[in-house]
Amino acid sequence: MLSELFSDALALIKQYKRIIIHRHNYPDGDALGSQKGLEALLKDNFPDKEVYVVGDEATRLPFMEQRMDEIPDEYYSDALAVILDCGSTRMICDDRYKTAAKTLRFDHHIYAEKVADLDIVDSTFESACGLIAMFARECKLKLSPTSATALYTGMVTDSGRFVFDSTSARTFELAAFLMSQPIDLNNLYYNLYAEDFSEIIKDADNMHRIKFTKNNVAYIYTAREDLPTNGDAAPVVSTGLVGLMRDIKGVFVWVNFTESEDCVHCELRSNRYNINPIAVKYGGGGHKKASGCTVPNRAAAMKLLEELDALAAAAAASATPATNN
């Protein structure tokens, strides 16, 4: 099935001289890696094509040096828009993709809705970068160090350094395929995970803010007035804080709440149970064990927390952990 979809995608790519690559707002390593990786892949294999990348400026991973292109609206009328790492239309940065001649999506979230003319969605992949890597391998496309490094970055970040459940034998096969190119792993991991001492102190302070529900759901709530003043947007802060609760012994569900100007950003996580239906109920989505949503206020956030607590209680009572993804 994937082989056929990859062939269809390659045919679409060959058909259009201009290709514009989109991804989700507030990009993480997988969004940026898939965007930069696909951009390099297309430029390496189709040097006569115009390839552009669009979206909000990335602040979380400056070492990736992924600049965004500013292009006029009229570029879309005869272009193929490629959408990466987006489980729904609300996630897509820059809605001009709707005016493109044709659209193509590569994604690894749980399927929620049709987004593109050709949707390639497989939630068994650990990352959108892994899906692009397999596309490159199956279609026998030329791979450069730039493309390989970007795609590897997304694979390692979205798999939690190859720890999360979505990591599979295929993950390592594709990582090995990418490592056929000279990736500087020491430099990559340093840029991804080394922190200034001041940031480590902040992490320690934030850990002191962790609270627990009756059934041991860990959570942090950050009010808008308590947001850091370094310019990071609330979704970026929220994603960073949720990871602090990942390795607490005896905690199987955790959530971070971060207020912004008009909503509360919620990052839901579990290492055992399917929390996705709760995120979907509140208008979000993602994966079985890693999902997100936004709610209008603190009261709604606390209601969501109650539902996570009830899930943890029911799951503990039945003692039947969920399976992968």
Where are the model-predicted features located?
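Membrane-interfacial amphipathic helices and adjacent loop/beta segments
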Residues: A58-D69, I132
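An acidic intrinsically disordered interaction segment
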Residues: M1-S7, R90-I92, R96-T103, S123-I132
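Glycine-rich, phosphate-binding/catalytic loops in enzymes
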Residues: G37-E39, K98-A101, V121-D122, E173
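Hydrophobic helix-and-loop "lid/oligomerization" segment in the mid-to-C-terminal part
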Residues: L2-N25, G29-P62, D73-D78, T157-N325
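Structural signal for conserved beta-strand scaffold positions within catalytic alpha/beta enzyme cores
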Residues: V53, I83, R105, I120-D122, ...
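Active-site cofactor/cluster-binding pocket
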Residues: E65-L118
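Short alpha-helices
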Residues: H109-L174
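Conserved beta-strand segments of alpha/beta enzyme cores
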Residues: E50-Y52, K102, D119, K142
